[in-house]
Amino acid sequence: MRLPLALLATLGIATATPAAAPREPAMVRVRLDTPYGPIVLALDARHAPRTVANFLGYVDDGRFDGMSFYRSARNRSAPSYGFIQGGIRTDARRILPPFPLETTAMTGLRHVDGTISMARRAEAGSAGGNFFITVGAMPSMDAKGDYPGYAAFGHVVSGMPVIKRILALPTGGGMGGQLLLKPVRLIAARRLNGTPHPTGLVKPWLVKTRDRPAH
């Protein structure tokens, strides 16, 4: 049975534009730390350079740190398959400027088992700080004809048992009953190769407000 394709994306737009994306290794490895163990990703900077640059902006700035995996979309007829979704959710303080969608028709990548791809709203260029990881092949998310699909940009190297564990967690509430009742904390996201290149943009979530003195 085909899964719903409406994927939650972020709200708000940053007001500044980061510098041009630096050159990266052809494959950039990133580790996502969770309470259930690490997930290691290989990001395909050769075939999806803009999407990888966007994701690494969040990683190198620490914008994913302390966020969560908050959605589990299971296939109704085969619940061990589907995708999990994580990222900044609707935290507009952490969002980076939008970027053009790199479709699978452009990159040659496909939504196979263990693919990481960008979540977005209905607008093709609305991807930002939320992503999903597939369990099982999901060709319905690939570009086809006038349908742009979603921006696949890498794959899981290790940690599929962690992903499957998150996929199996209880859900309910919004997003068609797919929101995790207890989101799984994304403790930190760190690159394992290449050189970090922070965007240099402001990090308002780190700014602590001072208590006003009592009168």
Language-model features: locations:
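Bacterial N-terminal signal peptides
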Residues: P4-A14
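Cyclophilin-like peptidyl-prolyl cis-trans isomerases
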Residues: A16-H215
